[in-house]
Amino acid sequence: MKKTEKVKFIINTLEDLYPKVEVPLNHKDPYTLLIAVLLSAQSTDAGVNKITPKLFAIADNPYDMIKMSIDEIREIIRPVGLSPMKSKGIYGLSKILIEKHDGKVPKNLKDLEELPAVGHKTASVVISQAFGIPAFPVDTHIHRLMFRWGLSTGKSVKKTEEDAKRIFPKNLWNKLHIQIIYYGREFCPARGWNFKNDIITQKIGRKSVIKKFLI
């Protein structure tokens, strides 16, 4: 199957399975999305969604957030892990948003990536899902599936993102990256993978991946 045919099959299959998708992290505006995505690093969306209601009930904007101490933030977010780093990041970025951006979340990668504890993936999620700017954030699910589907080498997340942007239509990026995450969780996980249920990998998967499973 040609790569263009693979891409068309992936897009059509994901659209059939997930015609409507939402960001898995609960939020109400760009700031709360930014905080939620930051918290999700090396954690689960479900875990983040359990603690953000308590945090946002106290502070759902940078002005209220810096009224809290780093220790107070840390105590609330402790269950999601990496709380020392994340609490400092939340406090620090909130302060910078007030000082440099009038308390608003910037709409570009450069300014977002200059904020404490905000990496490229986090920034990409924010511009994509908060502002509708085309981006293709790559998480572990997308990185894994792009390799299994033979669409990227799997050498690095950066390479996977470059390949995804080159292969998939730009107007689909914002929805498609979430659809792939949904599919990865449901049909193509890193552990407990049931190849018989994975209709996309069965159809267009990398030969070495399929062969390894069948042996």
Placement of each model-derived feature along the sequence:
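Catalytic cores of DNA base-excision repair glycosylases
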Residues: 2-215
